[in-house]
């Protein structure tokens, strides 16, 4: 599986959120039955919500200082496909998108994902690209987290 088909990197869109969740859970594991720590939405991200809505980005409505458990944030990321929560998870983990994206790219290299480049934690940026084979590698790793 993952050895046939186009090996040219193409934009992943929201599939990038699998790596966001993988990196976050690897570094902040949840125990069975736990909701994990509670984070709050930054004023900066709350202020960006109208812009994200205007661009048609997937999101959930948030307000500044709104609490989210780790589990609720991951559910919003993976079920709702909320771009704004992808950026919040990046901030909670690394302080900003750039630091988290560096971790995403380092993780891709560690896993052997040679055709993948991440440029943002949500996949909205078309510069985030990958191959089918690399996504199989990631999904196999994600199933072990």
Residue ranges: model-predicted function:
Residues 1-133, 140-143:
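Active-site-adjacent loops and short helices of periplasmic peptidoglycan-processing enzymes
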